[in-house]
């Protein structure tokens, strides 16, 4: 298993030298458009802040709607898993381990038809082989739109 060639995950030194916002800018890629060829880039996900126990990103509604004109639930869940996976990676040795989503659920409590959503993922459990993240999405008015939970499995790169 190899990571995306343009992906420059933060090193332990980066956490001491860079702010959560600077780490997020690194994940947004050199053009600020996300990492080419990834689902996150296609969905328009942009990182705002990244830390080992909290990751924040935004995603536009435009381009991610279902036929009725609202934000697609699948796009919302993809955003949740993206943040949980990246947040998990921040807690690993990226040369030896990777984290992948193995369980994901979400409850959509309010529809969104314009603007963007902001997602905040918080680490709620960290074990040797599993990490569990709680992700809350809000609209531009600060109203909760979805509540999600994602479990990531930690695996060795050679596995």
From Swiss-Prot:
Spell out the protein name for this chain.
Putative esterase DR_2406
In the record, the note on similarity to other proteins reads: Belongs to the thioesterase PaaI family.
Question: CDD domains in the record, alphabetically?
Answer: PaaI_thioesterase (cd03443)
What EC number(s) is this enzyme filed under? 3.1.2.-
Q: Which domain of life is it from?
A: Bacteria
Which terms does the record give in the GO molecular function aspect?
1,4-dihydroxy-2-naphthoyl-CoA thioesterase activity
- What is the main EC category here? hydrolase
Q: Which GO terms describe its cellular component?
A: cytosol
Q: Which UniProt keywords apply?
A: Hydrolase
Q: Does the keyword Hydrolase apply?
A: yes
């Amino acid at each position: 298993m190899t990571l995306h060639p343009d992906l420059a995950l933060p090193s332990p030194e980066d956490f001491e030298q860079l702010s959560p916002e600077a780490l997020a800018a690194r994940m947004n890629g050199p053009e600020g458009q996300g990492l080419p060829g990834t689902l996150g880039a296609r969905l328009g996900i942009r990182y705002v802040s990244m830390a080992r126990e909290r990751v924040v990103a935004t995603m536009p509604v435009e381009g991610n709607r279902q036929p009725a004109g609202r934000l697609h639930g699948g796009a919302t869940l993809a955003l949740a898993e993206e943040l949980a996976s990246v947040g998990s990676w921040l807690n690993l040795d990226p040369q030896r381990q990777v984290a992948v989503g193995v369980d994901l659920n979400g409850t959509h409590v309010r529809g969104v038809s314009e603007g963007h959503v902001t997602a905040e993922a918080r680490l709620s459990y960290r074990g040797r082989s599993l990490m569990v993240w709680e992700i809350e999405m809000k609209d531009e008015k600060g109203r909760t739109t979805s509540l999600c939970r994602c479990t990531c499995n930690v695996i060795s790169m050679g596995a």
